[in-house]
Amino acid sequence: LSKFVLDASTLLAFVKEEPGVDTMPAESEIISFSVISSVNLAEAHSKLVMKGIPANDAWEAIMAPIGEVADFNPHHAKRAGGLILQTRHLGLSLGDRACLALAIELGVPVYTADRVWSQLDLGIPIHVIR
């Protein structure tokens, strides 16, 4: 299996064992092959903390299934910013664009729980998990 990128919605679905995670590669493969942008990691962490999970517990929960965290560097920021015209009609956030930019940069598939992403044609496979 090759690397693949997870967005925050997919990471949260995996951590909370929500419907749709069965369409993703097996847990052992996620640990070894997933990559997530530091922006999306912060987003997932924030959502768990907002649900009342203590910050340290939330951090441990989201870090457990992750293979690699990609720093949001200037090159990544430029690519994410450049996606605004291709994505704004769908209402994608900066976090969404950071995720997509990482997948484009790495040339790998991306997994999301956001159905609207299926309308994108960015030259990378986009897998909607539900």
Describe the function of each predicted region:
Residues L1-I36, L48-E60:
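Short, well-structured N-terminal submotif of metal-dependent ribonuclease cores
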Residues L1-K3, V69, L100, I104-R130:
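Acidic, PIN/NYN-like endoribonuclease modules and their adjacent C-terminal/linker elements
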Residues T10-L11, N40, H76, A98-C99, ...:
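Alpha-helix capping/helix-boundary segments
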Residues P25-E27, A61-M63, G81-Q86:
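Glycine/charged-rich beta-loop-alpha catalytic/anionic-binding loops adjacent to active sites
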Residues I30, P65, L122-G123:
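Short, structured coil segments at secondary-structure junctions
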Residues K51-A55, T87-R88, H127-R130:
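Short, hinge-like loop/turn segments at secondary-structure boundaries
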Residues E68-Y111:
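Active-site neighborhoods of divalent-metal-dependent phosphate/nucleic-acid chemistry enzymes
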